[in-house]
Amino acid sequence: MPVRDTFGLVPPWAEVGLYVLFAPFAVVFVVGLWRRLSWAGLRRIVTHSSGGIAAAIGRFGRFGLLQRRVAQRPRGWPHLGIFLGFLVLLAATTIVAIDWDITRPLGFRVLIGQRYLFFESFADAFGVVFVVGLLAALIWRLVRLRSTGPDQRRIQYQFLVLICGLLYLGLTGFVLEALRFIIHPVTWAGWSFVGVRLASLLSSAGVGPIAQTTYEALWWTHAFVAFSLIASLPYTTFLHSVAAPLNLMAQPGRPQKELSTPFDLRQLMETGEFDVKVGATSLSDLDSGLRFALQACTNCGRCDEVCPAMAMGTALSPRRLVQALRARLLAGLTSEDVLARNVVKHADLWACTTCAACVEACPVFIRPVDYIIPFRRQLVAGQQIDKRQTEFLANLSRSSNAYGLPAEQRNQLAAELRSAAGSSDE
């Protein structure tokens, strides 16, 4: 009867040795993840998400599992393949561990008979999806590397290392499967349609005599690379695989184009406590949700591509702004005055038109505008504005328009603007 023999082709001590090897990697992973995310992500899903847990799960399904924003562009399809393939293969590995370490000692096997055969075919199919997605992503990253600016080189190299590591796992997974069929042929090998074909190719190449040695070497290197990627997750761009889904699920209830407010005047009137901070100078002044969202950023640049201020040639880059704040967060500099240290430049803050195009473009629902507005408010509250900006704000306060025109001339101005717009169209 078909049954999964997980450690059948390695020495008896390898099973214990594998878990001993995994232990230090697991410690590095858990400590790093706790330092990066703590329990803030889960807490925000419960306390901040719009519509409760059901709505949070719905957002995760639409924008996490189905990658609706990511897949809107052709370059997003490889990511969808990588994501789905990784998710299925991770689930498959988990099922294998449960079958061998939990149910087998209890006298029950999960991966046996027809269940095991369907499992093998399903895993092979999504393994192909995983590898194809990684190959497409690798080609795209290598092509893009030529035009990448210095500020993005480091993150691009991280992505390349991550892609190569995952690709190694995908390819060696198939090779290990093929070697298993060479060493121990079975009648049901056809259900593993990739492994059985690769086994035929390797046999034709004369791998048979060294199949056992090759299998053991690949088995250990496969495990080592997998454990290394797990341990690196909290410290590299791979962190977005955890932070992004949590940020998707923990979205606030207000519309994407609605600006944040530092306080509710009605609540202040009711409580009588008027000691409020209008703006922000450091990350510690921002809402915990905004600080958490920084860790979900993948530096993809979609916000830059749709930013009208950047298209007009201003210095503003929503991507660079978020990445600069993210770097301070990961360095633990949450109390640093980012305005005084010029981490966030005044010109960048005033270049933003608050159109929220970046908010709509972000695949993980980061809101760059929500970082800009508090810092801009601080500049106004601290009178760190030039004469033109002072006049602009005074005109808005005095006459409700930026030009300082009397209220009775507003209709005339609107008519002139419509006329000018009409003549330009002609």
At which residue positions do the language-model features occur?
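Membrane-embedded alpha-helical bundles of multi-pass integral membrane proteins
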Residues: 1-280, 323
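Peripheral terminal and linker regions in Fe-S/redox and tRNA-modifying enzymes
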Residues: 17, 32-33, 74-80, 87, ...
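Short acidic (Asp/Glu) and glycine-rich catalytic loops that position anionic groups and cofactors
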Residues: 37-41, 224-225, 300-304, 352-356
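General structural signal for alpha-helix termini and helix-helix connectors
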Residues: 67-71, 309, 381
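Alpha-helix boundary/capping residues
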Residues: 68, 245-248, 328, 379, ...
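Flexible gly/pro/ser-rich segments immediately N-terminal to CXXCH heme-c attachment motifs
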Residues: 153-157, 161, 210-220, 286-298, ...
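Active-site-adjacent bridging/hinge elements
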Residues: 202-203, 297, 333
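Ferredoxin-type iron-sulfur electron-transfer modules in oxidoreductases and energy-metabolism complexes
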Residues: 265-294, 302-304, 310-405
